[in-house]
A protein has these predicted regions:
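Jelly-roll (double-stranded beta-helix
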Residues: 1-334
């Protein structure tokens, strides 16, 4: 995320006490409990949170299964069109994910849940991009409550505890991307001061972080489902983990809406990098938003044939018509 945010109660400096009335505090210690979330070791962005209770207390740990990534049978090299609009609803926003494609850099899932997400979830080893295909809802997270709507990219940094609460369960529809690296905006979009350049396809105003903290003061055991790689672990914590009273930093969940993307056009066809939205280790995410087609008087208003031999290209169709494809529909993947 491009800039610093803060929410809730904070002490004036890092690593000093944030006092609270001793009668209200855990074991009468009179403090809130500092918790630092770092990325890339200690070398990149981080955030500092303050909990009602120590976030380290775990009552029990048990295996909870595995997400199996089984490659399809060996087949001839060919184009693929997956129609996913009518996938049968199953599970919840976590257990209902169906893996469709994967490599060493990411896993792509479709998810049309049949049940509400009851158990809190944390991906311990991957950033997640959750594209909201239908309706909206609220994400309850370590960093507070965050509204999402149709067309949002909901970016969830690794280790964030969250639960998705849709406005209409019957319309809940997601595309999940699970990333080995850190999801970020393209470096070329920012000036040396960290601000988006004029002329980039979005600005800081288009990114939305949690605006409301609702710390849960609950000392009862709470179940948390944790995913690391393909392995699932069920942890029983000694308190509710969404008990943060304040945080600040550069790591937090946020939304960016595809309809806020400001597409670039040219006299002739521009290649996909001009529509780039995010980057990560080994892949990029582009948004092909509605835009004027090429306006050179002799322009051929369809993309030229090209061989992108060092990358796989996957398109997810949200709505509308796409100039270079026929026969696709909403929620098609090619």
């Amino acid at each position: 995320m491009p800039n610093y945010r803060k929410l809730g109660k904070l002490p004036p400096k890092r690593h000093i006490k944030l006092d609270r009335p001793q009668g209200e505090s855990h074991l009468g210690e009179g403090i809130y409990y500092e918790h630092i979330l770092t990325t890339v070791g200690f070398d990149r962005a981080y955030s500092i949170m303050y909990h009602l209770r120590p976030p380290t207390r775990v009552r029990a740990v048990e295996r909870a299964g595995e997400v199996k990534l089984e490659p399809a049978e060996e087949m001839p090299l060919r184009h693929v069109h997956l129609r996913t609009a009518d996938l049968q609803r199953q599970g919840d926003a976590i257990t209902g994910r169906i893996p469709l494609m994967f490599n060493d850099d990411l896993v792509a899932y479709r998810c049309r849940p049949a049940a509400p997400q009851e158990t809190l979830y944390r991906n311990g080893a991957a950033d997640e991009v959750i594209f909201i295909q239908s309706r909206g809802g609220t994400a309850e997270t370590t960093f507070g409550r965050l509204r999402y709507r149709r067309g949002d990219y909901l970016v969830m940094p690794r280790t964030t505890v969250y639960r998705l609460i849709p406005d209409d369960l019957g319309q809940e529809d997601y595309l999940f991307l699970e990333a080995r690296g850190v999801i970020r905006t393209p470096a070329r979009y920012s000036n040396p001061d960290g601000q988006f350049l004029l002329g980039t396809p979005y600005s800081e105003r288009d990114f939305h972080s949690p605006t409301e903290l609702n710390p849960v003061d609950d000392a009862r055991d709470t179940v948390l489902l944790v995913k690391v790689g393909t392995r699932l672990t069920r942890m029983t914590l000694a308190q509710h983990p969404l008990d943060v009273v304040g945080w600040d930093g550069f790591v937090y969940p946020y939304t960016f809406n595809a309809w806020d993307f400001e597409p670039l056009t040219g006299t002739v066809h521009l290649p996909p990098p001009f529509q780039q939205t995010f980057e990560c280790d080994g892949f990029v995410i582009c948004t092909f938003a509605p835009r004027y087609l090429d306006h050179h008087p002799e322009a051929i208003k369809v993309p030229y044939a090209h061989s992108n031999v060092q990358a796989d290209e996957v398109l997810f169709y949200v709505e509308g018509d796409f100039a270079s494809r026929r026969g696709v529909g909403e929620c098609s993947l090619t």
